[in-house]
């Protein structure tokens, strides 16, 4: 709900907006990257096929809850261990939130352990590929901030 949201983004015609209302100053960076990711997501989805078959990166028996209040307890094992699939419960609500939480963590320091998981690494790879394709960055040799934890080759 808007009462508990720390940020939101939307597009009005050719204008893009991000509104931030973090509860703590420390969460400002995370909230900014998260909402920025949603804007990026829209472009990747309209300009590329990078997110086609996104659900194939998840276990076969998993389905996004599509509900912010859903009980995700049955999937708790997907949040830990070497084959971790999701950053947190919120990432299990919608594919866009999964990608936003991954992008947010990929852009902030201290998250190496999250991306040691082959599944999260594959998701990050897909996100990075999508961004490069959508913004015509495929031939740019530099690594971008969100690629700092990428271990797979481009």
Model-derived features: where do they sit?
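Active-site-flanking segments in enzyme catalytic domains
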Residues: 2-154
């Amino acid at each position: 709900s808007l009462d508990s949201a720390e940020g939101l983004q939307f597009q009005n015609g050719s204008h893009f907006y991000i509104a931030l209302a973090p509860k703590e100053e420390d969460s400002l960076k995370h909230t900014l990257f998260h909402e920025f990711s949603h804007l990026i997501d829209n472009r990747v989805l309209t300009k590329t096929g990078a997110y086609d078959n996104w659900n194939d990166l998840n276990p076969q028996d998993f389905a996004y809850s599509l509900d912010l209040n859903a009980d995700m307890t049955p999937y708790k094992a997907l949040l830990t261990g070497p084959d971790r699939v999701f950053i947190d419960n919120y990432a299990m609500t919608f594919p866009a939130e999964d990608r936003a939480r991954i992008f947010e963590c990929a852009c902030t320091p201290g998250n190496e352990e999250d991306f040691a998981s082959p599944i999260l690494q594959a998701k990050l790879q897909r996100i990075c590929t999508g961004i490069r394709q959508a913004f015509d960055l495929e031939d740019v040799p530099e690594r971008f901030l969100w690629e700092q934890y990428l271990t797979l080759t481009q």
